[in-house]
C-alpha cells in the first residue's frame, strides 16, 4: 500500500509540473488565428510518461524526485534552443552558418563580421532603414567614443513614449524574470548613438524601433545573451577609445509585424571586437503570433 501511494504521489507531481509546461513547447505560427495552446493534445502522452515513471519507481527505496528525473523545461532565463529554433525556422536559410551558443543567441558565420575594414579615424555616423511597409529593418553606424551617450533619456529629452511600433500588444505581470512581453526594441541603442548630432535616438522613432521581447532586448550576461549583452561589448570598446563599425538588422517573415530575430554585427579597427550573432525574438513565458504581435502566456 505504501508503494502504491508513493507511485500515485509521483504521478501527481509529474502531471502538475508537465501539463503547464506543455503550452510553452512551441512558438505560435504567423497566422493570426493559430495562436493556441498544446495542452489538450499533450495530456495523454504526458500521462503515459508519468505512469511509466511512477511504475518504474514503485520498488524504489526513496520517494524523492530530482530535477534530472523530471527533465523540467525552460528553467533557464534564456529561451531553450528548441524554443528559439521554432522562432527562427523560416529565416534559417538566410544564413550559411548558424550555431546556438548555449546562452540564448546564435553564432553567425563562425562569429566573423562581414562589415569589411574599419578605419581608426573619422567622425561617427548612424542611419536607419525601413522597408516598403514602414517596418524598421536595419541600422548602420560608425562609432567612436564621441557617439556615446552617458546621460539618461530624461536628461536629453528622449524619455518614455506612448508611441507603439506595429505588433506591440503588451502583456504585463508575466511569471519569471521577464515580467513584460515586449519592449520598444531599438536597432541602434541609445547609449551607443545618442550623442550623434542629428540622429533620433528616441523611443518613438519608427525607423529605429520595432516590437522586441523583454528578454531579447534586455538580457545582458555571458550566460544570457540578449541584444544588451552584445551592446555592452561595443560600449566597453568605445569607452576605450576604439573605432567600431556596427550593424543591426531586424528580420521579418513575409508581412509579419513582429521580427523573428535581430542580427547584430560589430568590428573594431584594431580587431579586438569582431562578432556576428543572431538574437531570436522570443521569450520563455510567452508564445508570439508574429503576424500581429498577439501574445499567449504559457507559464
For every predicted segment, state its role.
Residues 111-127:
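N-terminal post-signal-peptidase region of extra-cytosolic proteins
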Residues 27-111:
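N-terminal, intrinsically disordered, polar/charged segments of Gram-positive cell-envelope systems
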Amino acid at each position: 500500500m505504501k508503494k502504491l501511494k508513493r507511485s500515485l504521489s509521483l504521478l501527481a507531481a509529474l502531471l502538475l509540473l508537465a501539463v503547464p509546461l506543455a503550452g510553452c513547447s512551441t512558438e505560435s505560427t504567423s497566422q493570426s488565428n493559430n495562436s493556441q495552446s498544446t495542452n489538450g493534445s499533450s495530456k495523454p502522452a504526458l500521462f503515459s510518461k508519468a505512469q511509466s515513471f511512477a511504475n518504474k519507481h514503485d520498488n524504489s527505496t526513496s520517494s524523492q524526485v530530482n530535477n534530472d528525473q523530471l527533465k523540467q523545461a525552460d528553467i533557464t532565463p534564456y529561451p531553450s534552443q528548441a524554443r528559439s529554433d521554432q522562432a527562427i525556422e523560416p529565416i534559417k536559410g538566410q544564413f550559411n552558418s548558424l550555431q546556438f551558443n548555449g546562452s540564448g543567441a546564435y553564432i553567425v558565420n563562425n562569429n566573423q563580421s562581414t562589415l569589411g575594414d574599419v578605419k581608426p579615424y573619422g567622425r561617427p555616423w548612424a542611419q536607419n532603414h525601413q522597408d516598403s511597409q514602414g517596418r524598421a529593418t536595419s541600422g548602420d553606424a560608425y562609432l567612436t567614443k564621441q557617439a556615446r551617450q552617458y546621460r539618461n533619456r530624461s536628461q536629453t529629452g528622449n524619455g518614455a513614449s506612448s508611441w507603439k511600433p506595429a505588433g506591440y500588444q503588451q502583456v504585463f505581470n508575466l511569471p519569471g524574470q521577464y515580467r513584460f512581453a515586449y519592449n520598444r526594441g531599438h536597432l541602434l541603442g541609445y547609449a551607443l548613438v545618442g550623442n550623434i548630432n542629428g540622429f533620433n535616438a528616441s523611443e518613438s522613432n519608427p525607423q529605429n524601433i520595432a516590437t522586441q521581447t523583454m528578454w531579447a532586448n534586455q538580457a545582458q550576461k555571458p550566460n544570457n545573451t540578449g541584444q544588451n549583452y552584445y551592446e555592452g561589448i561595443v560600449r566597453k570598446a568605445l569607452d576605450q577609445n576604439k573605432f567600431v563599425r556596427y550593424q543591426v538588422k531586424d528580420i521579418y517573415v513575409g508581412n509579419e509585424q513582429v521580427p523573428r530575430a535581430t542580427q547584430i554585427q560589430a568590428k573594431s579597427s584594431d580587431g579586438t571586437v569582431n562578432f556576428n550573432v543572431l538574437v531570436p525574438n522570443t521569450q520563455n513565458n510567452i508564445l508570439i503570433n508574429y503576424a500581429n504581435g498577439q501574445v499567449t502566456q504559457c507559464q
